[in-house]
Amino acid sequence: GAWQVKKQYTQVGSYLQVPDPENRLCIDGSFSMFAYIWPSLHPKVGAQAVCGRYDDFNNIGYAFGIDETGHLGFIVADGKEFDAVLSEIPLQRHIWYFIGASYDASTGRATLHQMGVVNRYNSLWGKVTPMDYDSHVSETLRFKPKHAPDISFLVGGTWDFHANRGKFVNELYSGKVDRPGVVSRALSREEFDHICSGGKPPKNDILAYWDTSVGYTDTGIGDTVTDTGPHGLHAIGVNKPVRAQTGWNWNGRNDCFRLAPEEYGGIEFHDDAIIDCGWDVTHRLTIPDNLKSGVYAIRLRAGEGTGLGEEYIVFFIRAKTPRAPIALLIPTASYLAYANDHLTFDAQMAQPIVGQTPIVSDIDIEVYQSPEFGLSTYDHHRDGAGVCYSSYRRPIVSLHPKYRNPMNGVTWQFPADLSIVAWLEHCNYDYEVLTDEDLHREGVDSITPYKCVITGTHPEYYSETMLDATEDFVVGGGRLIYMGGNGYYWNVDFCEDEPWCMEVRKLDSGMRAWNAKPGEHYMQTTGQKGGLWKNLGRPPQKALGVGFISQGFESCRPFRRMPDSWHRTVSWITEGIEGEIIGDFGLAHGGAGGIEMDRYDLEKGTPPHARIIASSGGHTDNYMLVCEEVLYAFPGMTGTYDHRIRADMVYFTSSNNGAVFSTGSIAFGQALPCHNFDNNVSKLLANLVDAFSKDGSLPGGAWISDEKQWR
């Protein structure tokens, strides 16, 4: 049917908002304000509001701001016009400053202080750089500030208004803020110096003091910033300002907030962050109780219903009571990591890494030009910082079933996983679906009812809970078919209060789009160290038998059966397949082996009794060894030279009749539909699913003792 829709607006940018029902921060007399700041955006991009209670549309209130020339200002306005005290020296990017301003109501005198607080670790430049950071300016203002009672104090922006969208936050700040505060009198230079050096503001005069280092626990910190002053004016994060970030006094000795929370007062803001569009509900759909578990989409059409006029809202129906023997585990965490990525446009490596010219569509351009769509964890914020949060509360075009990755011209993530869904449907298997969020929330209990769990083509992002559950499932007798490449790679977690939001910290190793800054390697949401599971003692080889070795994107190759495949414990896997070649076809560049690939590696934890069923080979030099495998770089680490660059199909058994089969290749699943599903890749997978989904012992179990002598 037809739905009536309306234009809705999205608040972009992260900031803190301070509920102040008694208007404690509508100050009639003298006052002072202060903060430590670390600006990160080039000043010439436009004005930024650091903190204050200011309405830019109505010219009323007070605030710290940065003008278009990069100069700090203390601004007051009376409802008609504004006046300001400006620093003499522009702020520099990635430098820590203490800023303070006082206003004496009896004289109208305002004083602005700007002082660099650079140590050997905390800023872009060190002590040897002879830069003058300090400025102290005092002027008599033309009028005293007035206040609008219907606005709140903000950190990271200022209030604005538009006739169509109403009130919103504008002049968004990019950078860190640490321990801002407001006191009820004009402080002296000596008192500001005391706070600048790490002292507390005068206790009896505090109106609000947001101690950004308060609230850390072993499991992270939330979005609420504690006001330790007498009025409890706690600040609420909007669009997830990033916490667990180093503050002005970080001295380089501690790399985690658990060790020195007082050095982690930095809260980082980005003017293009988006976590929740905050839209009103347009339409509600009630899912029938008898709807089968599976993958569904609502198709929306506007106008002619083509191109940008067509959209799909994808959703997954989980069984209320699991009954099927097979579960398809939808890798929604990885979908979230790649959601609306801008790599084609912004990444200099995009074209050489895929070995071809990207081809963009109208929707790619639309997403790139519209900040309301948000960013992926492969992108950078406008100030150059890596994006560590991704959320489902926004439109995600890469979840469109018809979407093609513009970089490599093939399906990717969800659209690629539809090949597995199509195969299950074509073969009439009795299966149900669940998502990464289900696995993360409920652990092993979510998959224990199933005999066989099948993953998607690229389950790259995995939380500790998910990894624990997967291992416990196999140890308990479950059978796992890992259908992808480069899986179980990055450690992630979901925000407890915002389960639609995921965090990742990309560190000093791994194929990555950005590096977390020094000292900022631990996640706000859990307190866990981010980065590769390999570097946390849990390489994917330990759970899957294979781990990431190479990526190429421009071509794929077939698999060739290995000697292990003829052993009587595993020969059933290739039963009915003629010859040695498997998968010399596929929707992903004509082969089942490629895109991103994993290999068998005993030194990284592949179980010693694991069998290599088949391996790809003959990859091009566009396939390079992943960087975490490289200690010294030298020629020859590419597909035509390095024997390690291959995809390995690996099988091994576990306790209680459990087992794992890994394809080692993203392209494997996209070979299934070829020749109307009548092909040797499909046959191999059918052999596995048939065996894995039945009660009793696995085929070849009668000779399982042979494994002790086989290698």
Tell where the protein language model's regions lie, with residue ranges.
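Extracellular glycan-associated modules
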Residues: 1-243
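Signal that preferentially marks extracellular ectodomain short beta-strand elements
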Residues: 22, 164-168, 271, 275-291
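Helical hinge/lid and interdomain linker segments adjacent to catalytic or ligand-binding clefts
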Residues: 272-273, 284-286, 290-292, 409-496, ...
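Aromatic-Pro/Gly-enriched surface loop or interdomain linker
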Residues: 240-275, 302-446, 696-697, 702-710
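Solvent-exposed loop/turn segments at secondary-structure junctions
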Residues: 57, 160-161, 217, 332-336, ...
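Structural recognition of the beta-strand scaffold that forms the well-ordered cores
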Residues: 75, 208-211, 326-330, 432-435, ...
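Short, aromatic- and glycine-rich surface loops/edge beta-strands on solvent-exposed regions
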Residues: 294-300
